[in-house]
């Protein structure tokens, strides 16, 4: 793993008051790249000078499996040269009272991967829609999730 990826993981971990996982999540006891008390995050980056980021269906499926036996909410982070895209399940947004509508929804069941190039797009896989948002919007969601989890004793 290169220094750029480590720095991105450390920055995201700091942002959510979490920690970067040992071996970037390849241990049986610590999955994903970043964990906090509230979220479990998988971070995917592009090559250093690319401004195009790809969302792969398998990443969503893997993250969903990894959070199954935890009390954390899944978040997928895609990082290009100039932007970070945070993907959060729409049902999680509804849970914390954030009714977000998407400009469009892309069905991922018929694609293995797709280029992500804008915020406020939904990506549907199975019964879940993952909403793509910017860092500021994600932090609003994260703070509500923290408050919600603390209230419920999670």
Segments and roles (model prediction):
Residues 1-154:
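Catalytic phosphate/metal-binding cores of nucleic-acid and nucleotide-processing enzymes, i.e., regions
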């Amino acid at each position: 793993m290169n220094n750029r990826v480590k720095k991105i993981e450390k920055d995201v971990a700091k942002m959510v008051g979490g920690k970067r996982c040992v071996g970037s999540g390849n241990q049986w006891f610590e999955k994903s790249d970043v964990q906090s008390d509230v979220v479990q995050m998988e971070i995917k980056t592009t090559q250093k000078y690319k401004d195009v980021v790809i969302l792969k269906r398998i990443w969503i499926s893997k993250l969903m499996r990894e959070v199954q036996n935890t009390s954390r909410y899944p978040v997928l982070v895609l990082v290009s040269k100039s932007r970070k895209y945070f993907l959060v399940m729409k049902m999680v947004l509804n849970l914390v009272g954030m009714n977000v509508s998407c400009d469009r929804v892309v069905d991922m069941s018929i694609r293995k991967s797709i280029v992500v190039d804008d915020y406020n797009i939904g990506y549907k896989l199975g019964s879940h829609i993952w909403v793509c948002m910017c860092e500021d919007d994600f932090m609003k969601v994260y703070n509500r999730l923290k408050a919600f989890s603390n209230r419920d004793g999670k």
